[in-house]
């Protein structure tokens, strides 16, 4: 005899298939109301419905299988009023936030990056922030990021697109209707690409120098975090460390200042610090975002990869700032990153031939041991978080 569980299972599967078929039909039926030229009130209602669908994973999966609908949505997002561009743009933001939909979006409209870039760089476009957020979401993973970069370079040859993007990022009043904070994460994601880092680190362009003040940008942690992420990625290029730490850029004070608090130092210690880090006000606040603090520490850590870099970081009193940060830091993972950097600064120099930590070849057995130690650290960190009452993840 067939048990009730089996019978209800078949019924449930049939019901689920019927629901999926109905949802597909619903998506197809929406298409005529989304195309350009459709009646305005119906078009607005259809765009709102699609926006609601993108709020759930099942809705995003459904829409990902409808390339014509995705293409119509992009057309609406870049269309002038009275088209419902805002709702269409926000639907694209939600879709692009789902990594499982990235390739479907790019396949539905291969010109999507170029079209959105034009919106982002238009000082009059009211939904430029949403367009920037779509591009930032699409560029989070390496493969879509590379595809996106290829399209951007084709749309704006000779790196003009990157130059204009940086200009918009560094000009808070670029668009009166849109703050463009998401250009920060977009540039950070794009800086995963060697070609972008080469542009940012070109001594003749002075791009990095324009980004440095934004490490203190108080109006948006999104913009600030994106810039810090960009600088951290640039610090992977150890051949540029001498230039970055030298007088032309002088990156270290910009990385350390957000990590500094109101603590007082002795006169002898104060003399070790760069001028910008001396005699800070009693109400000096550290960077409030833990993720950004960690990226700042990681950037300084990368600058210590070479022996000359370690010497410069030591000579500029980084240890003093990190010592006080470690005493204050409430987040265990950030404190751990701080500890590792302090160990590099106060530890002995590596033996001959291993001075560049980014070029050291680690044997497989040692790498496995390091991975096991890292896993052990993560487990201890998780236990500490639970002990402090943090929720389980």
UniProtKB/Swiss-Prot annotation:
Protein keywords: Phosphoprotein
InterPro entries: ARM-like, ARM-type_fold, Hgh1, Protein_HGH1_C, Protein_HGH1_N
Residue stretches in coiled coil: none
Residue numbers of Phosphoserine PTMs: 221
Domain of life of the organism encoding this protein: Eukaryota
Pfam families reported for this sequence: DUF383, DUF384
Family: Belongs to the HGH1 family.
PANTHER family: PROTEIN HGH1 HOMOLOG (PTHR13387:SF9)
Protein name: Protein HGH1 homolog
């Amino acid at each position: 005899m067939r048990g009730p569980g089996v019978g209800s299972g078949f019924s449930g599967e049939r019901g689920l298939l019927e629901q999926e078929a109905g949802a597909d039909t619903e998506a197809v039926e929406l298409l005529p109301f989304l195309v350009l030229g459709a009646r305005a009130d119906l078009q607005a209602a259809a765009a709102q419905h699609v926006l609601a669908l993108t709020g759930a994973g099942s809705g995003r999966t459904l829409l990902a299988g409808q390339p014509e609908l995705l293409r119509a949505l992009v057309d609406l997002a870049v269309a002038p009023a009275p088209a419902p561009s805002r709702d269409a743009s926000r639907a694209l933001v939600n879709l692009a936030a789902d990594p499982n939909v990235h390739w479907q979006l790019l396949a539905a409209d291969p010109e999507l990056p170029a079209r959105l870039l034009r919106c982002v760089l238009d000082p009059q476009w009211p939904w430029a922030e949403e367009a920037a957020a779509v591009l930032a979401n699409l560029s989070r993973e390496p493969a879509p990021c590379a595809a996106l970069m290829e399209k951007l370079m084709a749309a704006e040859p000779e790196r003009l697109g990157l130059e204009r993007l940086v200009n918009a990022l560094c000009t808070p009043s670029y668009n009166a209707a849109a703050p463009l904070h998401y250009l920060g994460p977009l540039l950070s994601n794009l800086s995963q690409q060697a070609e972008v880092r080469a542009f940012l680190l070109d001594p003749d362009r002075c791009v990095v120098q324009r980004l440095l003040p934004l490490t203190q940008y108080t109006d948006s942690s999104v913009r600030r975090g994106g810039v810090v992420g960009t600088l951290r990625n640039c610090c992977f290029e150890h051949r540029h460390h001498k230039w970055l730490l030298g007088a032309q850029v002088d990156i270290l004070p910009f990385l350390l200042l957000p990590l500094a608090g109101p603590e007082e130092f002795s006169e002898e210690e104060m003399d070790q610090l760069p001028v910008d880090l001396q005699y800070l006000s009693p109400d000096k606040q550290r960077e409030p975002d833990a993720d950004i603090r960690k990226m700042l520490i990681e950037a300084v850590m990368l600058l210590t990869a070479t022996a000359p870099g370690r010497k410069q970081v030591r000579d500029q009193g980084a240890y003093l700032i990190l010592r006080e940060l470690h005493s204050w830091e409430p987040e265990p993972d950030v404190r751990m990153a701080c500890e590792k950097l302090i160990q590099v600064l106060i530890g002995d120099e590596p033996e001959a031939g291993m001075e560049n930590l980014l070029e050291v070849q680690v044997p497989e057995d040692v790498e496995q041991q390091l991975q096991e130690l890292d896993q052990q650290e993560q487990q201890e960190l998780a236990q500490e978080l639970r002990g402090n009452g943090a929720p389980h993840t």
